[in-house]
């Protein structure tokens, strides 16, 4: 399977830096990496999607066409920008913003019906990891049980919560075992990405694992040259 790289700007990128980053990436991305790169700015960092060489996505959207949902963006906002790719289930939205499994299912089903490409994030906390691999498998299976795993526009990103933003990636053995288990659950055509303190130093080794189909990258993607270095490992 062709490997891919995704940049998640979270809420860290200044608005105009985000705009400049997108334009520069479009100009400088090498042809062998066209269609293998995704970028998820925050909402103010988005631009009308006229980009031909990479996929522009949104970090979040409310599962309605439009309406009285103060502070939210909806499918019509994204469609007006010609954006049809969405992150769902990121741990920061699960934990900080209390998005429940039932709400994540509602989001998934709504945007599946709109034929959006969905990047669905899963991952366990440290307390679960410390209980052993059986507990991890049960936890991740539960996170996936409410969504359509045969949806053709699905990408799954495994991000162990204890590794996100800690500068402590999961070990190569942990990634190998966990991705191997998840590959048994997922449709064989569904890409499975790893995220969690990915950086220039470890990205190439992680991509070398057969069951890792790409990377979802946080802070290491916030400087364009760093992200392009990681892209070069694809």
UniProtKB/Swiss-Prot annotation:
Active site: 90 (electrophile), 159 (proton acceptor)
Major subcellular site: cytoplasm
UniProt keyword Ribonucleoprotein present: no
GO CC field: cytosol
Enzyme class: isomerase
GO biological process, one term: gluconeogenesis
Catalyzed reactions: D-glyceraldehyde 3-phosphate = dihydroxyacetone phosphate
Subcellular location field: Cytoplasm
Chain sites annotated for binding substrate: 8-10, 165, 197
GO MF term set: triose-phosphate isomerase activity
Pathway(s) this gene product operates in, as recorded in its UniProt entry: Carbohydrate biosynthesis; gluconeogenesis; Carbohydrate degradation; glycolysis; D-glyceraldehyde 3-phosphate from glycerone phosphate: step 1/1
Subunit structure of this chain's protein: Homodimer.
Record-stated family: Belongs to the triosephosphate isomerase family.
Record NCBIfam families: PRK00042.3-2, PRK00042.3-3
Biological function: Involved in the gluconeogenesis. Catalyzes stereospecifically the conversion of dihydroxyacetone phosphate (DHAP) to D-glyceraldehyde-3-phosphate (G3P).
Protein name: Triosephosphate isomerase
Natural source organism: Helicobacter pylori (strain HPAG1)
């Amino acid at each position: 399977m062709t490997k891919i790289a995704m940049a998640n700007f979270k809420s860290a990128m200044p608005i105009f830096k985000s705009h400049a980053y997108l334009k520069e990436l479009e100009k400088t991305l090498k042809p062998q990496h066209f269609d293998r790169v995704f970028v998820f700015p925050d909402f103010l960092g988005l631009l009308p999607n006229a980009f031909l060489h990479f996929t522009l996505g949104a970090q979040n959207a409310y599962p309605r066409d439009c309406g009285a949902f103060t502070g939210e963006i909806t499918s019509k906002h994204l469609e007006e920008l010609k954006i049809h790719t969405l992150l769902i289930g990121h741990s920061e939205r699960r934990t900080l913003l209390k998005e429940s499994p039932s709400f994540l299912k509602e989001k998934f089903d709504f945007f599946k019906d709109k034929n959006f490409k969905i990047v669905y994030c899963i991952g366990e906390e440290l307390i679960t990891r410390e209980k052993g691999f059986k507990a991890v498998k049960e936890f991740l299976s539960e996170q996936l049980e409410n969504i359509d795993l045969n949806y053709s526009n699905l990408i799954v990103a495994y991000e162990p919560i204890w590794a996100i933003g800690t500068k402590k990636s999961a070990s190569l053995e942990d990634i190998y075992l966990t991705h191997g288990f998840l590959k048994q659950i997922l449709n064989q055509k569904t890409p499975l990405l790893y995220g969690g303190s990915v950086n220039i130093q470890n990205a190439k080794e992680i991509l070398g694992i057969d069951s890792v189909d790409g990377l979802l990258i946080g802070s290491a993607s916030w400087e364009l040259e760093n992200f392009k270095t990681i892209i070069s490992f694809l």
